[in-house]
Swiss-Prot record:
Gene it is expressed from: COX23
Record protein name field: Cytochrome c oxidase-assembly factor COX23, mitochondrial
Transit peptide segment: 1-13
InterPro entries linked: COX23, Cys_alpha_HP_mot_SF
The keyword Ligase is assigned to this record: no
Native organism: Coccidioides immitis (strain RS)
Disulfide bonds listed in the record: 38-69, 48-59
PROSITE patterns in UniProt: CHCH
Function text: Required for the assembly of cytochrome c oxidase.
Compartment(s) of residence: Mitochondrion intermembrane space
Length: 82
């Protein structure tokens, strides 16, 4: 049992080491680089594909909504960076 506890501690230490390297970068990046506001549209289109056995023709509205969202988001990001 103590060998498992030691392995768990080693895994935890290793994950903290990797997070420590990324933490500073994560905290100093704009939120948009870690959050996709169009993720809900992407999830809905995937659910539609699963519901319709992969028939893309049944999900065109979902795909278009995702493309419109992504286009608006990219336009907004470009304007914000000016």
């Amino acid at each position: 049992m103590s060998a498992q506890a030691g392995a768990a501690q080693a895994n935890e230490d290793e994950s903290h080491k990797y997070w420590g390297k990324a933490e500073q970068q994560f905290k100093h990046k704009p939120a948009s680089q870690f959050f996709d506001p169009c993720q809900e549209f992407a999830d809905r289109s995937i659910k539609c594909m699963r519901r319709n056995a992969g028939d893309r023709d049944m999900c065109t509205d979902y795909f278009q909504a995702y493309r419109d969202c992504k286009k608006a988001w990219m336009t907004q990001r470009k304007e914000a960076s000016r």
